[in-house]
Design a protein with these regions (language model features):
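Pyridoxal 5′-phosphate
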Residues: 1-307
């Protein structure tokens, strides 16, 4: 273990700053200021990231294209709106350790969880339960409970909670729950990072345990994407969803992201909600009555992205 000698003086702090390879990125963001004009020390990126200085430039470019092209901006804009969501694909794939055709930019986090649970929470009389952690982000809990009710079950019976001990979630406890009730669990929905404690969960192990019990598994990566290294394709959850306004600095309500493992890309529109953006790109604007399914994660889109 390396020794770390901490000193409580300005010179030492400045020395650490000078050795920070990422320090130059600070100048690319806008910081709120105190009344005295000094910029604040911002430690709220886990809630809302700072605004990048280039945001206004990018917004104005889109507004200019809209004014110049009108509807033709779908194909003629500097960043054509028809394929706008694809610009995020390579970045999302790199950030999440996914294949590019497994990720999609769409909607916002909880909307995406509902869209994905439409596919991956398919309860029956035997296997109808959802497992979450007891200290889950409230929106995840509300989404899970509403899905349970929507399918005619009672959350008091169908929602299983993985309890922490001394503010830590232990994988052995999860394993015991799965061993006892695995054949009744339709979906395991857990975060990559527990939002309150900061605990990084062993996602690969959780996915393996879920699959061995025949359970679908989804990950909420709101506090993980852009924060820790991820390998979704290798770990093989059925799905994952995340927001972009925390560590990705996308701004309040910015478009979310979703991952659907390529093993599910052949469902051809039979297990998800559909809309015209789920339709194959080549036939989308032909306005035909026959649905032609997109062949990858695009199938889970419903509407065009919020440019």
């Amino acid at each position: 273990m390396n020794n770390f000698n901490f000193e409580t003086n300005r010179t030492y702090a400045q020395s650490l700053d000078s050795q920070d390879d990422l320090a130059h990125y600070r100048s690319e963001f806008l910081f709120p200021e105190y009344k005295n004009g000094y910029s604040c020390v911002y430690l709220c990126g886990n809630s809302l990231g700072l605004q990048p200085k280039k945001v206004k430039q990018y917004l104005n470019e889109e507004l200019d294209d809209w004014s110049k092209y009108g509807v033709h901006g779908h194909t003629k804009a500097g960043r054509p709106w028809l394929t706008y969501h694809l610009q995020a694909r390579s970045g999302f794939a790199e950030l999440t350790g996914s294949l590019e055709h497994e990720v999609i930019a769409m909607n916002t986090l909880t909307v995406n969880l509902h869209m994905l649970m439409t596919t991956f929470y398919r309860p029956n009389q035997k296997r109808f339960k959802i497992l979450i952690e007891s200290t889950a982000f409230p929106s995840d809990r509300f989404a899970a409970e509403s899905q349970i009710r929507l399918h005619g079950f009672d959350p008091k019976e169908a929602l299983i909670e993985w309890q922490p001990k001394d503010d830590e979630l232990f994988i052995d406890d999860l394993q015991q729950i799965i061993a006892a009730q695995g054949d009744e669990i339709a979906l395991i929905l857990v975060p990559g990072i527990q939002y309150y404690s900061g605990q990084v969960l062993p996602m690969q192990e959780i996915c393996q345990m879920a699959k061995s019990a025949g359970c679908n598994v989804g990950l909420d990566l709101a506090h993980a994407v852009g924060n820790i290294e991820l390998e979704l394709h290798k770990w093989a959850p059925d799905f994952a969803a995340w927001c972009t306004y925390k560590y990705l600095n996308g701004g309040p309500g910015s478009v979310g992201g979703a991952f659907i493992h390529e093993a599910h890309h052949g469902s051809a529109g039979n297990e998800q909600l559909l809309g015209w953006w789920s339709n194959d790109l080549e036939s989308r604007f032909k306005m035909g009555a026959e649905f032609v399914a997109a062949k990858d994660a695009d199938l889970w889109q419903v509407s065009n992205p919020p440019v």
